[in-house]
């Protein structure tokens, strides 16, 4: 007899009716607890023994239910992962969860059960089904979010942690102008300035006083650069790491906070309770200290920005500006500013660090990249000055032999789908733009 058959026998009464699993747990727990209490009475505290017995029996019965009768029991995945969340939590704290889930997808396919009530997907269609907009007759605009996880991030929700559709739409609408093409182009010179400062600092630190080469911690330098850039774009001033020539301790603290905090959020969202929180609090000093320093730094930057606002636009301008007689409260402004800082700095630094490591490990890719970059401009003189006048002359572009075969002949067949591919293979059809391109193209061209 297999496990499923045994479980089904447990859940059937003498007359064949199905018994509630929780009723079984209650009866079994009581019997086991009493028996154990009598066995070791006077040696172990009876109340604690009863609690232990209840926990053990309830856990066993729950696992049997999860692998036999649970609505997700038929989905592929390891038995122990489906029986309890502890296997995934254990791998989470070991830092192996992402890699182990990837291995499970290789074994079981695009859909894997990784916890009693959780499925992991890896297909392209799953992106649209889970996160995409719902269309047609479906009244639900998006799939509901897991409130226990989102509510654990912060008391005041940000654009990252807002679980409701209306709340997220509200914050997104306020922040959207800051990320428009026009606004980002206006901020581009600021970013370029910090990139130049970053490169200058690398050059000045890659040699010691004797002229010998010195290894650099690029992860630290990338963090310094990205935090300074995002700090200036968000609050109107950098955090000062590039100017100091070393990574600010604050950056290290909040990076540790982010790493530990992510694991703690997942854990507490599935295992709520005061005992769990006290246990994690005893282990999470890094998380607590990092969170406090992060909040303090964000508050200092926000207060300074609100007192000394320049005429230059920044990312949180829409959050602090009163509109239609309404202004967002301070806590929500602070929470969103902190979220933007984290989202735009550490993530970019991690990507650049990984990209650098992979390029160094793959010399052929590095050589190709170097060739593309260095062949674009041989010197600074090749870059057009910002004070110069530039424009595309349509007649020249349309009649250039570099753009079209037989440019001065009437050959409308060049635009047809059934054209002679070989004859017109060198044509650059996008060189002809009678309606212009960009934000000032003809609105009625289509």
UniProtKB/Swiss-Prot annotation:
Starting at the broadest rank, the lineage of the source organism is: Eukaryota, Fungi, Dikarya, Ascomycota, Pezizomycotina
State which residue ranges cross the membrane.
Answer: none
- Name of the featured protein: Cytochrome P450 monooxygenase ATR14
Q: Which organism is it from?
A: Stachybotrys chlorohalonatus (strain IBT 40285)
Pfam families reported for this sequence: p450
Which Enzyme Commission number(s) are listed?
1.-.-.-
List all Basic and acidic residues biased stretches.
408-430
User: Which prosthetic group or cofactor does it need?
Assistant: heme
Which GO terms of the molecular function aspect are on file? heme binding; iron ion binding; monooxygenase activity; oxidoreductase activity, acting on paired donors, with incorporation or reduction of molecular oxygen
Q: Read off the SUPFAM superfamilies from this record.
A: Cytochrome P450
């Amino acid at each position: 007899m297999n496990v499923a058959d045994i479980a089904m026998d447990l859940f059937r009464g003498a007359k064949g009716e199905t018994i509630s699993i929780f009723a079984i747990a209650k009866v079994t727990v009581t019997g086991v607890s009493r028996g154990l209490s009598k066995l070791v009475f006077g040696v172990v505290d009876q109340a604690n023994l009863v609690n232990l017995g209840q926990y053990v029996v309830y856990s066993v019965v729950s696992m049997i239910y999860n692998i036999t009768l649970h609505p997700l029991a038929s989905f592929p995945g390891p038995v122990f992962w489906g029986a309890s969340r502890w296997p995934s939590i254990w791998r989470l704290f070991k830092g192996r969860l992402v890699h182990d889930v990837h291995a499970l997808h290789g074994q079981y396919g695009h859909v894997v059960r990784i916890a009693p009530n959780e499925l992991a997907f890896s297909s392209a269609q799953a992106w649209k089904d889970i996160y995409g907009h719902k269309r047609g007759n479906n009244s639900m605009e998006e799939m509901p979010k897991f409130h226990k996880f989102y509510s654990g991030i912060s008391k005041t929700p940000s654009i990252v942690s807002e679980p409701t559709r209306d709340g997220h739409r509200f914050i997104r609408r306020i922040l959207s102008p800051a990320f428009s093409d026009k606004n980002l182009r206006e901020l581009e010179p600021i970013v370029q300035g910090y990139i130049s400062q970053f490169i200058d600092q690398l050059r000045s630190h890659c040699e010691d006083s004797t002229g010998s080469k010195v290894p650099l911690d690029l992860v630290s330098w990338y963090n310094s650069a990205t935090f300074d850039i995002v700090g200036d774009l968000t609050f109107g001033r950098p955090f000062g790491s590039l100017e100091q020539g070393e990574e600010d301790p604050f950056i290290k603290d909040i990076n540790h906070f982010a790493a530990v905090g992510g694991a703690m959020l997942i854990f507490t969202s599935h295992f709520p309770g005061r005992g769990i929180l006290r246990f994690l609090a005893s282990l999470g000093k890094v998380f607590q200290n990092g969170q406090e320093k992060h909040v303090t730094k964000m508050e200092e930057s926000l207060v300074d920005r609100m007192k000394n606002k320049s005429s230059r636009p920044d990312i949180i301008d829409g959050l602090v500006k009163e509109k239609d007689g309404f202004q967002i409260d301070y806590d929500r402004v602070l929470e969103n500013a902190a979220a933007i800082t984290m989202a735009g700095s550490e993530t970019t630094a991690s990507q650049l660090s990984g990209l650098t490591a992979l390029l160094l490990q793959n010399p052929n890719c590095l050589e190709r990249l170097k060739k593309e970059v260095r062949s674009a401009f041989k010197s600074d003189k090749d870059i057009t000055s910002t004070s110069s006048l530039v424009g595309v002359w349509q007649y020249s572009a349309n009649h250039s032999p570099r753009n079209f075969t037989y440019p001065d002949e009437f050959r409308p067949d060049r635009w047809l789908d059934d054209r002679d591919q070989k004859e017109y293979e060198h044509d650059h059809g996008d060189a002809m733009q009678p309606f212009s391109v960009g934000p000032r193209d003809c609105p009625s061209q289509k």
